[in-house]
C-alpha cells in the first residue's frame, strides 16, 4: 500500500542529524505559535549555546552519519522491500563523507597558517555556526511565517484590485505638464 507522505530527501536526513535542534524546533512549533516571545528568547539562547558547541559536534555528527545512514538505509530497504527508500540515505551518507572530508582538510591546512590568522578564523567559524543554528531553529520553529506576504504587499495587492475611474488621477504615474516649458525653464530647476 503506497504511502501518501512525501519521502524525506537525503539532505533533510543529513541536516536533521547535524542540526538536531531542527527536529526539536519543528516539534515545539505549536507551542511557539502560542508563546512567540518566549519561543524567540529560548531559541536565541539555544542558538547561541549550540552554535558555540557546533564546532565540536559538527565533525562528530558527520562521522556518526557515516555509520548511521547506511544502516538506516539498509533497514529501510528491507522494510519496504525496495531500493526506493534507500536513495535518500545514500545521499545523506555522501554528504556526511564530504562534510567530514572538508573538515579534516580544513584542520590539516590550519597547521601551516600563522596563529594570528587561525584565531580570527575560529571566531568567524563560531559566529557562522551560531547564526546557522539560530536560522535552523527559527525556520523550523515558525514555519507558517515563511510564506505570509508582508502587510505592505497586501496593501499593494488590494490597491491593484480596486477599479480605477477615468477621472481620478493616477498617483503612481503623475501626468506630464500640458504646457511646454521653454528651454531656459527646463534647465533652471
Curated annotation (Swiss-Prot):
Keyword Transmembrane helix on entry: yes
Keyword hit for Cytoplasm: no
UniProt keywords, alphabetically: Cell membrane, Membrane, Transmembrane, Transmembrane helix
Membrane topology category: Multi-pass membrane protein
Pfam families attached to this UniProt entry: DUF5422
Gene Ontology cellular-component terms listed: plasma membrane
UniProt region (Disordered), positions on chain: 165-189
Superkingdom of the organism of origin: Bacteria
Entry's transmembrane regions: 49-69, 78-98, 102-122, 124-144
Predominant location: membrane
Protein location: Cell membrane
Family (UniProt): Belongs to the chlamydial CPn_0442/CT_006/TC_0274 family.
The name this protein goes by in its record: Uncharacterized protein CT_006
Organism: Chlamydia trachomatis serovar D (strain ATCC VR-885 / DSM 19411 / UW-3/Cx)
